[in-house]
Amino acid sequence: MCALALVSVIPAAQARGHHHSHGHHGTPWCGIYLSHYLGKQDRNLALARNWAHEGAPAPGPGVGVVAVWPHHVGIITGQAADGEWIVHSGNDGNAVRTRPRSLAGVIAFRYVS
């Protein structure tokens, strides 16, 4: 319920140009989901790219590190046997998923508490 309340306050201009599926109100929701998942109350984190400034910089991927792409955000939860990182995120195929994911294109790795 809390996540739905955040959806209504995101300006439409922020949602433009997002290549992932949009939720019920036409809003990209990966940032909203991660905010809820991590217990964050900052509306600015609804936009994936804004996670690039949250917390502290991490030197690279690792379990518990937030990975930020230009239009997506998720948290690394493990590493597959082949070395690919496992990422938990919302709005991954319009669903919440935990799966191996390429980190190509990541613009920031962040420690977020």
Predicted regions and their residues:
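Sec/Tat-exported extracytoplasmic proteins
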Residues: 37-42, 71, 110-113
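Sec-dependent N-terminal signal peptides
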Residues: 1-3
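Catalytic cysteine-centered active-site loop
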Residues: 16-63
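...with weaker cross-activation on analogous glycine-rich loops/strands in unrelated enzymes
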Residues: 43-95
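Aromatic- and glycine-rich peptidoglycan recognition patches
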Residues: 14-22, 79-113
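C-terminal segment of classical bacterial N-terminal signal peptides
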Residues: 5-13
